[in-house]
Amino acid sequence: MITCLLAVLVLTAIGQTNPYEMDEFNTPGGKTLTFHALVHASIRLQYDGKEIYIDPVTRQGGKTIDYTAMPKADYILITHEHGDHFDKAAIQQLTGDKTRLVTNPRCAQLYGSGEVMANGDMLQLANDIMIEAVPAYNISEGRTQFHPKGRDNGYILNIDGLRIYIAGDTEDIPEMANIKGVDIAFLPCNQPYTMTPGQLVKAARTIRPKVLFPYHFGHTNLSAVAAQLEGIDVRIRHYE
């Protein structure tokens, strides 16, 4: 059980080594886990000398990211095949001799390699890193074609006892009621592809993470979200 989360925001000026907002957390084992807000749904995690990238893309919304300037990945996780989540060029730039690529079934087909995880699968990446693939899909009328049930993944990462939920592209699906004990959650909020702000609030109230990072939000106005989530530390970073 996590009894305490310590976090600090580090801002680094554009043009220096790291121009991205960072949040640092202490794990129960006394190590540090750092999140870098790259762009849209792309997240970089650093932990105990390991580099983990979630849905890295080289271009999104007018932003360009040069992954050749970043360390090679130990692990790359891809939620699904849409272009704002799956980018072959980004994967190639980040791939080194020991990189492990974890994807949903469709992305493995498109890329030609990768360790496949379907909803419900679990994978031990290291002694202190476990991943569970969870459902991510649309439920609203007129949206189900964007992310059909059973195709895409969200991921729950357990890193040295710290539990992180990366939701992927999803709405506030019933399966969220089964997601317990989350320390840090990344929930999407843009229309028509993921959640409305109201759905985001509902999902956060269901999951009850200690810390919530809205992401994948485009031009969505999130100014009223934090006030509706008493007891949850809502942090809005520059993903767009």
Which residues does each PLM region occupy?
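Binuclear metal-ion centers of metallo-dependent hydrolases, dominated by the metallo-beta-lactamase
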Residues: S113-L125, I129, V201, R205-E240
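Metallo-beta-lactamase
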Residues: T17-G30, L38, T103-L162, R235-E240
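Bacterial N-terminal signal peptides
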Residues: I2-T12
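Active-site environment of divalent metal-dependent phosphoester hydrolases
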Residues: R59-G62, H82-F86, A108-L110, D121-Q124, ...
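Active-site neighborhood of phospho(di)ester-bond hydrolases with catalytic His/Asp-centered motifs
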Residues: I54-P56, A73-D84, L101-P105, Y165-G168, ...
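Active-site HxH/HxHxD metal-binding segment of metal-dependent hydrolases
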Residues: T64-L123
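Active-site-proximal loop/helix segments of hydrolase catalytic cores
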Residues: N138-T206, G218
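Pre-active-site segment of Zn-dependent metallo-hydrolases
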Residues: Y20-G30, L38, S42-E81, K88-Q92, ...
